[in-house]
């Protein structure tokens, strides 16, 4: 059976990066098969949790091909691994603890997502204040708040923070927390079972605070949108509070009817931007403090400079660093940080100028020939300008290379980039919204193709 396990590992090696394989698979031990369960020896509990969450969906089908009758995977902390490893001199990294899921009546809010655990910076200060003000019932603005940002920047954290705050401070309030997908599924189920009154009671008369995430899911779902409009109207009429989240301004979400756009856009709109360098440093320091692990300042600054995407990427890189340090029983150093961050960056989808041009043309409904032409038509000129800017932001191509792709001179490319950068400085300007919307489309498209 050792040969079969070797074949499983070889297949995994072909589908994973070298860093992922070395860290998570090469350290696995084949312990045998019991009652249809493939028993694997792991380094520690963190190793087990990572395998369950990230690799099991890929590992189980491969194992079933090579081990007849295997239906499940079972993980055990192998003897002599974490417990018996020699101690490193000095303060070594501790085992990463996983909080148990809090069992409670009503919506399940992540206990880690609180206002105290939210790192506030210039990128999210307004959204934080809006969510906190709503939780405190400060009547400084409309009773509706809409948080918008790209994925991984803190919308869900703030939404759960409101829920946790209300549950602890105002338990008498009836709080409903759902994603729009859950809202839609409950509505469809109620329709099929002739129980729409119960559905309406839950979200209208039986609700004091509605927390509704991922509005973009409703794109094109006309009947669900109409029901949500009725729900929002009744809640507003009764003086109740609503917090919604989305990945774009309501009016920029495609196939969202004008009534719903109006209801959502009529409240307080609170965008969240990507964290700046200073905020990224604070996020890393807060996360390492929460995990009770000491990370040298030079490593903190290196990660903050290297990982410039969303908060989730930053925390994921830090967790990977702590995991590797923990599993290998080695201190956290700058060299280890370089290795882990490079492994993570290698996994991110690469975006090309051609992909950017394709999305730009589709959005502005122009041809590639028009985009590259000398046309000064307003629509074409705007598309070209944004395309050049996004190429500068998302690729490693030089200005000269970008100019060649758009059939423009170096100075024309530089002018276009500067023009868009000026427009991005306007808080609610049309150009800024257009660029943010196309950036989201570009990132989503590349992630789905990777």
From Swiss-Prot:
InterPro entries: Chromosome_initiator_DnaA, Chromosome_initiator_DnaA-like, DnaA_C, DnaA_dom, DnaA_N_dom, DnaA_N_sf, P-loop_NTPase, Trp_repressor/repl_initiator. SMART domains: Bac_DnaA_C. Residues 326-450 are annotated as: Domain IV, binds dsDNA. Its main location: cytoplasm. GO terms for biological process: DNA replication initiation; regulation of DNA replication. GO terms for molecular function: ATP binding; DNA replication origin binding; lipid binding. ATP binds at residues 152, 154-156. Domain I is involved in oligomerization and binding regulators, domain II is flexibile and of varying length in different bacteria, domain III forms the AAA+ region, while domain IV binds dsDNA. NCBIfam families: DnaA. Belongs to the DnaA family. This is Chromosomal replication initiator protein DnaA. It comes from Syntrophobacter fumaroxidans (strain DSM 10017 / MPOB). The gene is dnaA.
